């Protein structure tokens, strides 16, 4: 008797049992999860049904975002094969050069060429992280004030050297991860606006969203959950959506193992080191480890974290509510913000509570 995807082991890990005879069935199951989440864009609900509906998919070249690209590509191909296809959407892929984010990462030249050959229906752009100065000029003023005495922005240096110096001025592992996430988000949003995208499709699974929920609350970013883990409008004026939110990381890993073309373009995740002291890990890394280990034992509990967070709704904001100069979050209690600086003609730097905590002089 053969076992299909919906039959599970009786053991403690609760991983899905997938035999070769049921791979088609399993792939259909995963595709349908994403298909439901993309229905509004596919049918153009509450949006113009004529003209292009361009969506941006930031591709980290990890398993999750690569699987999302593979699934969406298959859905678009299926739609185009119909005699009367639905209005649908156009997909643009953005790859932020991995070696510009982490010095331990290799250049993605060969992988990028392979991406374009594997998915010829879509347009691709590859940019380094330091191109944020060109796409988001306001950031230059923000970083010059953000670190205060810990960093001096030397405009005579190259964009890469300036950004490397700013990132090096952030002392703790938690603050480094937090600042890098904000920089990447700002770069993605700026690029999405440049090419007139309606929304951004993030490749976060249920596992990743649960870890992000716990980490953001711990870092003081609980108010940003309404757009960092929920589908809908972000404070940047661009929609954020998470089509993989109904899938666990283990399910995405299983899907990726079925398709050789994916294994050739995916940059494998570095296995977590068992010898790293807990104090040297960021809050984000700690929460991800916690969710992955506990998710194997109690998948329903971890799934409830994301489902509960997804029910949060942003309050109606008055038109004059300021936004954090760095992360973009709305600041309803800005009157208590002590992070503002005004130097000469420079405009005041307004920071939310979480960004103030990430400043070098306030970290310990």
From Swiss-Prot:
| Family per similarity comment | Belongs to the CTU2/NCS2 family.
Q: Where in the cell is it found?
A: Cytoplasm
Which UniProt keyword terms apply here?
Cytoplasm, tRNA processing
This protein's pathway: tRNA modification; 5-methoxycarbonylmethyl-2-thiouridine-tRNA biosynthesis
A GO CC annotation recorded here is: cytosol
Q: Which gene encodes it?
A: ncs2
Q: Which cysteines are joined by disulfide bonds?
A: none
What this protein is reported to do is described as: Plays a central role in 2-thiolation of mcm(5)S(2)U at tRNA wobble positions of tRNA(Lys), tRNA(Glu) and tRNA(Gln). May act by forming a heterodimer with ncs6 that ligates sulfur from thiocarboxylated urm1 onto the uridine of tRNAs at wobble position. Prior mcm(5) tRNA modification by the elongator complex is required for 2-thiolation. May also be involved in protein urmylation.
Q: What is this protein called?
A: Cytoplasmic tRNA 2-thiolation protein 2
Enumerate the Gene Ontology biological process terms.
protein urmylation; tRNA thio-modification; tRNA wobble position uridine thiolation; tRNA wobble uridine modification
Q: Which Pfam families match?
A: CTU2
């Amino acid at each position: 008797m053969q076992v299909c995807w919906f039959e599970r082991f009786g053991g403690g890990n609760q991983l899905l049992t997938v035999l070769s005879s049921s791979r088609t069935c399993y792939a259909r199951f995963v595709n349908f999860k994403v298909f439901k989440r993309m229905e509004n864009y596919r049918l153009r609900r509450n949006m113009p049904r004529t003209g292009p509906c361009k969506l941006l998919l930031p591709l980290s070249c990890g398993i999750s975002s690569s699987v999302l690209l593979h699934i969406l590509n298959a859905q678009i191909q299926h739609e185009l094969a119909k005699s009367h296809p639905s209005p649908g959407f156009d997909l643009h892929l953005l790859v932020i050069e991995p070696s510009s984010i982490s010095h331990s990462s290799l250049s993605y030249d060969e992988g990028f060429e392979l991406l374009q050959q594997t998915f010829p229906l879509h347009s691709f752009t590859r940019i380094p992280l330091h191109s944020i100065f060109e796409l988001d000029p306001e950031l230059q003023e923000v970083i010059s004030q953000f670190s205060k005495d810990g960093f001096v922005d030397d405009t005579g240096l190259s964009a890469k050297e300036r950004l490397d110096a700013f990132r090096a001025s952030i002392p703790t592992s938690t603050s480094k991860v937090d600042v890098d996430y904000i920089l990447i988000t700002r770069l993605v949003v700026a690029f999405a606006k440049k090419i007139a995208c309606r929304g951004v499709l993030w490749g976060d699974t249920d596992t990743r969203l649960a870890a992000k929920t716990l980490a953001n609350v711990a870092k003081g970013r609980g108010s940003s959950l309404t757009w960092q883990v929920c589908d809908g409008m972000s404070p940047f004026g661009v929609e954020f959506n998470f089509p993989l939110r109904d899938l666990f990381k283990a399910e995405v890993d299983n899907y990726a193992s079925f398709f050789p073309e994916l294994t050739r373009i995916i940059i494998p995740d570095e296995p977590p080191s068992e010898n790293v002291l807990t104090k040297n890990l960021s809050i984000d890394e700690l929460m991800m480890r916690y969710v992955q280990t506990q998710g194997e034992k109690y998948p329903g509990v971890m799934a409830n974290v994301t489902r509960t967070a997804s029910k949060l709704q942003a309050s109606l904001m008055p038109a004059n509510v300021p936004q954090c100069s760095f992360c973009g979050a709305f600041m309803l209690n800005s009157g208590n913000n002590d992070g503002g600086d005004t130097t000469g003609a420079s405009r005041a730097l307004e920071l939310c509570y979480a960004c103030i905590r990430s400043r070098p002089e306030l970290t310990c």
